[in-house]
A protein has these predicted regions:
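Glycine-centered short loops/turns at secondary-structure junctions
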Residues: 46-47, 73, 119, 142
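Conserved thiamine diphosphate
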Residues: 47-134
């Protein structure tokens, strides 16, 4: 599952889905859709592995649903892509109003503390080489997990960077 934001381009563009696999995402661009959708998927079929992709701003829209997951005994694996930004809005501002970027930087909570507070496994990934092992441990966790993937705002989407947007705008 995933919510809305530039982070969702990555799984939609680069993940392969098998015959019995599905990706649930919002058709209306709703931030915060991914975690509730992941929980609904687990309720529908508790035996299935459920993976939720969430941007940092996206997760903060409905992160309180971690309580629902705990209460209902659900165990999704949540990948939080943390670029400390509302990335889609930032991308549009850089492209359309390059000298007036405003209100897109965000301060995030300690996602590992949130994972611990709800009894979930938690890991923070800051280098690409750390991901595979962290992801495997998350998948193996019987309690569900949060894997926070710290990225640069510079890599605003798979198609462009902040630097490229500014260069195109002549700034």
């Amino acid at each position: 599952t995933h919510g809305a934001g530039n982070f969702s381009i990555w799984p939609n563009k680069f993940m392969s889905y098998g015959k019995n696999q599905r990706m649930l995402g919002p058709q209306s661009g709703s931030m915060g859709f991914g975690l509730p959708a992941a929980l609904a998927a687990k309720v529908h079929d508790p035996s299935r592995f459920v993976l939720c992709f969430a941007g940092d701003g996206d997760f903060q829209m409905n992160g309180n649903e971690m309580g629902t997951a705990l209460q209902a005994g659900l165990n999704p694996v949540i990948l939080i892509i943390n670029n400390a930004s509302y990335g889609t809005i930032r991308m549009h501002q850089e492209r359309e109003y390059p000298t007036r970027v405003s209100g897109t930087a965000i301060v995030n909570p300690d996602y590992m503390a949130i994972a611990a507070a709800y009894g979930f496994h938690g890991e923070r990934v800051t280098e690409t080489g750390q991901f595979a092992d962290a992801y495997q441990r998350a998948c193996d966790s019987p309690t569900g997990a949060i894997v926070e993937i710290v990225t640069s705002t510079e890599a605003i989407s798979p198609r462009t960077t902040i630097t490229a947007l500014r260069a195109a705008a002549g700034k």
